[in-house]
């Protein structure tokens, strides 16, 4: 599953299934990419999208580590492994490089 990623809406509770390896074939962890929903008609305040996604942690459907993979590490690997300079000059450059080197 190393090169298989899929995008997900921020508030979709089924995102948690990707990290529930006991229910996935071959005990695989699927690589989800946070889809922010910011462009949706029903998003009136962009600042609320990420906290809404974090409700999956608050409801014990995802661990904090799962959430970090969902919103940061998986997207970094998706874009950074195909273009190692993708994050150059951004606020997350240092953290992204650390993920790519791990």
Spans of features found by a protein language model:
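Mid-to-C-terminal alpha-helical segments outside catalytic/metal-binding sites
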Residues: 5, 9-31, 40-102
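Active-site glycine-centered loops adjacent to acidic/histidine catalytic or metal-binding residues
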Residues: 37
């Amino acid at each position: 599953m190393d090169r298989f990623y899929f995008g997900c809406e921020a508030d979709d509770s089924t995102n948690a299934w990707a990290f529930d390896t006991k229910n996935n074939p071959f005990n695989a962890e699927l690589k989800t990419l946070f889809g922010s929903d910011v462009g949706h008609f029903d998003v009136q305040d962009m600042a609320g999208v990420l906290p809404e996604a974090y409700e999956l942690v608050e409801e014990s459907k995802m661990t904090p580590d799962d959430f970090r993979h969902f919103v940061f590490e998986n997207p970094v690997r998706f874009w950074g492994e195909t273009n190692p300079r993708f994050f150059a000059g951004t606020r997350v450059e240092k953290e992204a490089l650390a993920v790519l080197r791990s």
